[in-house]
Amino acid sequence: MAKLEITLKRSLIGRPQPQRRTVQALGLGKTNSVVVKEDNPAIRGMITKVSHLVDVKEV
């Protein structure tokens, strides 16, 4: 299965609580933090919810 490299590109200041929780569930903390996750429907759904805050690359 493919892996996704997810980078938090925008700050969470002023963002609604559900978006903050989604970013936290992805394992991202500060701006420009990077995580590598398996590509599955659950992760894709979370990325869709915060697509305006993150940058995604396939590894």
UniProtKB/Swiss-Prot annotation:
This is Large ribosomal subunit protein uL30. GO terms for cellular component: cytosolic large ribosomal subunit. The gene is rpmD. Pfam families: Ribosomal_L30. Keywords: Ribonucleoprotein, Ribosomal protein. Belongs to the universal ribosomal protein uL30 family. Part of the 50S ribosomal subunit. PROSITE patterns: RIBOSOMAL_L30. It comes from Listeria welshimeri serovar 6b (strain ATCC 35897 / DSM 20650 / CCUG 15529 / CIP 8149 / NCTC 11857 / SLCC 5334 / V8).
